[in-house]
Amino acid sequence: MDTLATSINQFALELSKKLAESAQGKNIFFSSWSISTSLAMVYLGTKGTTAAQMGQVLQFNRDQGVKSSPESEKKRKMEFNSSNSEEIHSDFHTLISEILKPNDDYLLKTANAIYGEKTYPFHNKYLEDMKTYFGAEPQSVNFVEASDQIRKEINSWVERQTEGKIQNLLPDDSVDSTTRMILVNALYFKGIWEHQFLVQNTTEKPFRINETTSKPVQMMFMKKKLQIFHIEKPQAVGLQLYYKSRDLSLLILLPEDINGLVQLEKDITYEKLNEWTSADMMELYEVQLHLPKFKLEDSYDLKSTLSSMGMSDAFSQSKADFSGMSSARNLFLSNVFHKAFVEINEQGTEAAAGTGSEIESRIRVPSIEFNANHPFLFFIRHNKTNSILFYGRLCSP
């Protein structure tokens, strides 16, 4: 399971860099864990080159801890095998069960599903494996004759699964009579901070988008003993904010320079992020924390992005090999749709009522001001499995 979590985190950073190429200066927010999980559902039914490409993009067949080289990449593409695939899906089952374990302190709900044209029936074995590993049931629908009705039904299902927060996942004209198979995924999260911000401490402050432009934002404030980590190159400071129960945490990477986000994104790798955010790097400080309230909602049509990352065959009618999913010829993945929503406020992530008392440590620690008044990166992490659930870039609240 640790290896799978590493693969998901590596995929998160690769995907973030690819999305950043077409979103310079814009906010980014997505659930890497949700996207990886839903793509693994498709991967379960792939064979041959299609499977090898997906395994490469999703980092499933990368030797953990081994540095990449052209030779190792070529070898890795050729070493895909079915036993490796079975282990991956078994690990997904374990990871999903752990992350979605019922919890009184936060709520995580997924909406991952595969919809296939009914004239391309799924193998019984594939349906059984989907239920075993992912607790999911692929749906056979009538895209040919009722594509828009199916689109509306899918949107309604996603909305119900995400407490009404993810609406209209599939936009108008995104599904038509030529659609053969689509993948939809969304993740809804509601959590309460371990230490909540006091509403009366929230005031209007400037957020510096760059050296010449700023905008007024509602800036939250608290003074607490919190965990800080320092990054020497590129120069940045990080902070960990726990959610109640400490199963999840918000990690913020704040460049020291107002324009330092581009360099931070360029330099970040899974290995570096893992090192920066390790327990050994965390130090307890008396922190004067300034954090903007913000709400992000991003939608992604991931077909072109995933194709450019290397899994083009899955989207090709002539090249896709989904023989592990269906015996019908010419079955291919028409599109992958993803939508994510986050709201950071005084209570936590997404509004939630709650009160709590706490006992402050009397140990003297150094003090520091952490002023998130310019662009930064943030992650929501499941700590027990070390899995990045959400990746975000805030350029303008």
From Swiss-Prot:
InterPro entries: Serpin_CS, Serpin_dom, Serpin_fam, Serpin_sf, Serpin_sf_1, Serpin_sf_2. One of its GO terms (molecular function) is serine-type endopeptidase inhibitor activity. Keywords: Cytoplasm, Nucleus, Protease inhibitor, Serine protease inhibitor. Pfam families: Serpin. GO terms for cellular component: cytosol; extracellular space; nucleoplasm. It comes from the Eukaryota. A motif (Nuclear localization signal) lies at residues 74-77. The record marks R362, I363 as: Reactive bond. SMART domains: SERPIN. Protease inhibitor that may play a role in the regulation of protease activities during hematopoiesis and apoptosis induced by TNF. May regulate protease activities in the cytoplasm and in the nucleus. This is Serpin B10. It comes from Papio anubis (Olive baboon).
